[in-house]
Amino acid sequence: MVYEAKIDPSLADLFRNSDKEPFPAMTHELPPEKSLKARLLEQEDERISNVLAHEKRFSTEPVVIDDVFMSRLCVDSQPGCSRIPDIDIANVFRDDLESCTLSSSEDEEEEEEPIGQISTFEMLHAPRKPIVWSEQELSDFDMKSRLLDMRMDHWDLARIANVPKRIAKGETVNLRMPRYSAEVVKQRIAKGVTDIFGHFSLVPHTLTKSHKPVAERKQILIERYHDLMNDFDYATRPGSVESKKYANLTKRLNLCNDFLSAPKLPHRLFPRLIIRSIRPPETPKEPVKRKMRESESDDSVIIIPRKIEKEKPRPTTENVVLKKVEMEKKRPRSPELVPKKIVMEKERPSSPDSEAEEREHNLRIEKERHQKELEFRREALRKREQEREEHKKRAQEELRRQMTAALEESTRRQAEMNRQIEDEARKRDELQRIAEEKKRKQLLEDQCRAKQEKEKRDAEELEQMRLNIARLAGTKDVENALKSPSLVEIVPPSDARAFEMIKWNAVKCKIPENWEKRKDKFYRVFEWPSDAAQRDIERDEVVSIPRSKPIVIPQEDTYITRNRIPLKLPPKVKQAVPALVVRNSNNATRTVVAATVNENGIQWPAETINIDEVVREIRGLMAPTRRNFAISLSPKTDEIDYQAINLNRLKSGIVYPFYFSDGLYWPLVFLKSSKNGKPEAQRHVEALTSCKSFSGKYASRYLLTTTKEEDSATKKFEDAYADSDGDWADYSTKPGRFSNRAGFKPHYDTSNDSFEVQKQRAVDSLNSQYEKERNELDAFGRYTDEYRKRKDRAQYQNHIKTHLRELVRDARLDAFSFKEEFKDFEGGFEDYPGTRVEPYENDWYSHGYTLYSHTRDAAYADYMHDVCKPYEDMLPPTEYHEIFNEWCFTPMLASLHYQLKKNAFDVLSPQDVKDMEARHRKYIGLVQKERKFSLEQALDVCKLTDYDKRQWTILHDQLVTHFKDFPSISGLVYDRNTNLLANVNRNLKHLFSTIYRDDSPPDDQF
């Protein structure tokens, strides 16, 4: 019986309508698939090129006469030359002699050949002569073959199994190509011949049919595509066999219930035997045997008499022949119905008394049968009632148990709720107590401060009284004190506005006495690089920071996670402000920096910062979610589980959108030229290569090998890295690029080592990889220095482009972008690697950037900050960051459409797949070139849904690769002289203020 799989109607509709779904628009056409004719033409061109190469090779060399290959021209041109076996010229392209035609006859008809020089190409089209071997050569060959067989048998060597087939195939090869004149070619064109010049004459010989039987070829094909067939065989999928068993059990249960509800037993409880026999006449012993059988007990024997019929003529044979035995289907055995021994009564002479006895006996049997049937029904009814009572009793016990469990659960919940209320009350009392304690301490501090101020004023009054007494007394010391100047002469600056700003008192501060101890304690708490020289340099840099700039103190040990967040962005170079030159009586001068005035007219002292901004920034950096987020995403401690991270928690720890992604590409705006005349791409690569800790391949290894199974994960990474090379049109169509990734499926620890040992092994491996990448970058730096010294700018530019291509190739792993191309300026635009050409508007690319880097990469971070700072002004106001982040967080959701065609059923349900198809259709219609882009529709399409969160790992990988290769506004030529930034900023503010209007004040993000 062949089992027919039952397919879900929703899946069947999905596969039925899959061919009708429109494909996304492609800017570059895929290379067309080559037809059979095109492939054969390529084979023919390759063969002709080999012939020409061979002709060129042997045209100038002298001809060497040997017994393997010999030109016919040499044989005919030398009179008296002995007959040497000829060989087909086609064999010069083969290494074996399997295509040779062996013949022992020497009476071969020789064709007349033209005398003169014949080119190799003409000889190729000329008719060939078969090879003729003499009897001596054949005997020698046979003897050597036998000797070879003996040696192979001695050393147990295997022979070539298909030598006869190869020889038979080689004999059918015909390398002669017909040569047609112009008239013949015209006639063939008029007839519609496909092969006009006869280039396909070798097709029947090159494409031969396999000699294997059909069954063997089918078996090979099935084994080759076994995995693919299992994916689409719904009968062998998990759950199908269990479903079939469950259906059979359900069917049997229904039949049993129907039988118990209305049993219908047949009239006969025993098998019916219809026996027709042909017996000989009774012998003298037969009556005695019959009496013995009749004398047996009725409990063990039931005599079934034959029907009395007309006596038929009996043959005289002595053997009894059974003609036909029919038996009905046996009923299920039961203890009430046990068939007794059945003995067939032999035929007796019919008489009226025997007929009456037989009818009475039949009635008695029929009555007993009816009585047993009634007893059986009563017993079945009694059992049914008993089972019903037991089932009712079990249901009542189950209901009672559930009610008891529900009561216990409600009691437990009530107790838990009461406990929470008590905890909240206790916490509230604790907070109130802390507030009162704080208020009391503040009151004591105010009292102490007031007391100190009062004592200070009293001391000043006493000092003033002492001076007055001394002055009135007219002492000499007081006169000298009065003669000394008491005021400071102020020299006004050239700017008249400076006099209005002198309202600040200069307070001299000194370093605390325990500064050295505090500094040493700070360096001991945090883990610094093992390089002692580098550590000393960094310490000196920290100490030598000007007092006008804040000291960067990390809030936690972030060196292990390679995430170092600066407390403050590098300040801009401030313009020179007018200074006040103060002179005293001793001709000592000191410079006092004047205050500045901001846009609102409020005066602030120079070289100062807003305290509220610093406090808000410190609170954001010290928030619990931000502080713990780097630990949860550390790629060195354990495997990253993105599905376990809450979306709100992820957003709170991410400025936009991947704050802790190692090896991140900043969304750089490439300028046409800079102040020093270098292209921005060159400056970017120079700054990137000077960054000692950056590497595309090193960062990609974090994303692809986040598992404890080092061997398999490394192999998968190397395979993915090798597959990323080549034509993008071929690479983008590969199925299942995310379902079998190393970091996106649960991996179980198969090692018996402890976690510390495995962690140390992973750290050592990563350190070795880092050292290797650093050595490569150091070598690159040496090469660039040599190019600079030689001033070979062309070679230096080529080297820069090569390095940039490698970096882009590292970031192209599982990325959705086109093949990189390097071009010059065309119409004012410069094409860079990874540039997209979809018809988005400029507003679509508007998103922020993030700064995080290692301590030694501060130069590269400063460079990226200077380039991206003007573009950051295009962002919307702070109160709309949450909406703007969600909008920028989801532009690649709709690009997961290829998962629908490949392997989406491993992650999503059929309903989710339908929803994704609908969203994909909206997305394709949104980015069509003939339609204008609408930001409102884009916001509606790119909203996060529940099924997006269920495929969080795939989504995170898409977004990582998306923002690696997706420049911010690559199609926009950035020009500082235009008013483009102001216009875009104004439009964005108006857009977000109209769509997301909210009169309530924004919530505090921290």
Swiss-Prot record:
Organism of origin: Caenorhabditis elegans
GO annotation terms (biological process): negative regulation of DNA-templated transcription; positive regulation of DNA-templated transcription
Keywords, comma-separated and alphabetical: Coiled coil
Name by which UniProt lists this protein: Uncharacterized protein D1044.6
Lineage, uppermost ranks: Eukaryota, Metazoa, Ecdysozoa, Nematoda, Chromadorea
Region: Disordered, residue numbers: 326-371
Coiled coil, from the record: 358-473, 756-782
Tree of life domain: Eukaryota
GO cellular-component term (any): nucleoplasm
Basic and acidic residues composition bias: residue spans: 338-350, 358-371
InterPro entries hit by this protein: Znf318-like
PANTHER family cross-referenced by the UniProt entry: ZINC FINGER CONTAINING PROTEIN, ZINC FINGER PROTEIN 318
